[in-house]
Amino acid sequence: MYGLIGKMRATRGQRDAMMDVLLASTGAMPGCLSYIIATDPADADAIWVTEVWTDQASHKASLQLPEVQAAIAKARPIIAGFEFQIETRPVGGFGLPAVKTG
């Protein structure tokens, strides 16, 4: 599996609008096992995104989907920046298939 955890920043006061765009574009994407959007209780303009994919290629391919491209274009004016993005290797958990770690 392939995972990403990222923190995005909306322009001041636009967090909810940006979350609406992200939530509208998170329908069934091939290879996507989990796509979670969360607010940051300590930061009114921050959004955390946690993704789990079957593999990195599925994530990369998702960025070319027309609905994802449309969401990126719609959100671009209200994205203030990306604070960081971390790649992970999920090994399982509630709702995910187990992966051998050895």
Go through each PLM region and give its residues:
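Short S/T/G/P-rich N-terminal loop/turn motif that feeds into the first structured element of a domain
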Residues: 1-47, 52-66, 77-102
